[in-house]
């Protein structure tokens, strides 16, 4: 038996909470500004995969979609009970629902807390540490964004959003978190720091050379 309704009457977190550990596919459709519907495969209290239309989303894109659906108050849903089809090999998520809902709630709270501190979408950042440990979902974002943030020119939220298929605001949030953790710096500030250190290094080299020359005389 299918369960269906409107997101105006019941939000996605409430729908998922109601479903509990049931297995099946939850379809969300008729979303404003979206042509495609989304499907979420649930099995025993875990998210198995997320699809946009017929495309299975990678973990970073899946989290982005779920975060968007988490806050939306428009659209409709329908849950069809049963065992969902398995995901393509290597693309299974296996996320516990309770932990996922807690993470999304935390991110939503941080969105509001950081709203006035998020960087401009055009500000470019560069990685200052590449060997780092991060918790999800920041780790998934870092793994996707690292090749662009490790370049000498760095990358902006605007550019990363286009390359990774995410929203500008979401990318700005991740960049802000990475900057707070000391993993990124704005490109201009990073270059200024290097320029400030250059004379110190040159002075040290001169002193070492002078010392060596003095010993040989």
Write out the residue ranges for each language-model feature.
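Acidic, Ser/Thr/Pro-enriched low-complexity segments and adjacent helix/loop capping patches
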Residues: 1-217
């Amino acid at each position: 038996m299918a369960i269906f309704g409107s997101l105006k009457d019941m939000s996605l977190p409430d729908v998922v909470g109601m479903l509990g550990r049931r297995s099946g596919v939850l379809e969300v459709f008729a979303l404003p500004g979206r042509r495609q519907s989304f499907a979420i495969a649930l099995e025993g209290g875990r998210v198995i995969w997320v699809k946009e239309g017929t495309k299975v989303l990678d973990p970073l894109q899946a989290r982005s979609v779920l975060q968007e659906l988490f806050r939306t108050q428009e659209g409709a849903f329908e849950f069809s009970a049963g065992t969902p089809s398995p995901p393509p090999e290597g693309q299974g998520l296996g996320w516990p629902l309770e932990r996922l809902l807690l993470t999304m709630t935390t991110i939503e709270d941080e969105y509001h807390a950081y709203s006035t501190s998020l960087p401009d979408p055009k500000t470019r950042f560069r990685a200052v540490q590449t060997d780092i440990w991060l918790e999800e979902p920041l780790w998934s974002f870092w793994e996707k964004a690292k090749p662009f943030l490790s370049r000498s020119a760095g990358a902006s939220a605007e550019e990363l959003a286009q390359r990774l298929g995410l929203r500008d605001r979401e990318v700005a949030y991740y960049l802000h978190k990475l900057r707070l953790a000391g993993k990124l710096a704005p490109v201009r500030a990073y270059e200024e720091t290097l320029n400030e250190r250059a004379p110190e290094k040159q002075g040290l080299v001169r002193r070492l050379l002078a010392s060596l020359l003095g010993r040989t005389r």
